Amino acid sequence: MASKTSAQIPDEPTVVPSGLLKELTPDQLVRSRDNPRHLFDREPLDELKKNIREHGVLVPITVFQPKGQRKYYILDGERRHRCCEELQAEGHTVRLPANVVEPPTKIAGLLYMFVIHNFREPWELMPTALALDVVMKDLSVNDNKAINRLTGLSEPQIERCKIILTFPEKFQKLSLDVDSKTRIPSNFWIEAYPVLNLCEDELTGLAKKYGRDGLTEKLVDKYRARKIRSVIHFRRIMEAYKVAETKEDQKAVLDKLSEYILDVDLETRKAFD
């Protein structure tokens, strides 16, 4: 994991309001390709859609109009827009109140959304981590205090995101599955991280044979086989190793961990209770 290195806090790109409040129809709006939310689960969308059908859009969305274009691009409010599109397709007349801002840079728009969602419904952890990665690379910042000031994320949240970003993209994508039933929860990577480190440090033969990615895939397979009932059960492995008082006890835990990794049907609690 990347360490906390001191860094000068960069100047914060900002979103500049234009002072305009408009009412727009769904077809006047374009969704931003840079929206870091990624996940739009059906159940909360249905709840929001029902509320909009009954009361209209109560909270204005935030949009900007690129120079020379007629349509407005959504900076904040894609969920409301999606619901209004569906309602319009069902025959309802829907308009969205919209605060118009000056066209922002990509990074300014992203930081704006970070701040908005810190005070409202937070993003899922994986989209947050991927958005944070853009911020860190674009602004060349890795210091947690600087990131906190820019995004409003707490330092523990930032550390969790940095752990997620150590996993290859192919694993990150598993937490962006549009189907919540088959999606690997973002916390899976947080809880698996120390277990994988333990494997690399103490089960060197196993780690050399399969590689870190191979070990990760085995844990994913075990989760999909429902042999990891809760991702926090990974903590039992680390607790068992930490409380082992003798080398013989540690070896017994490591032998069980090796068996656990290789046997997809061995459930976590059964192995480490």
Model-derived regions: residue spans:
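Short hydrophobic/aromatic-rich motifs at helix boundaries and adjacent loops
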Residues: 19-23, 52-56, 101-105, 116-117, ...
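Short secondary-structure transition/capping segments
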Residues: 1-8, 12-15, 102-115, 142-154, ...
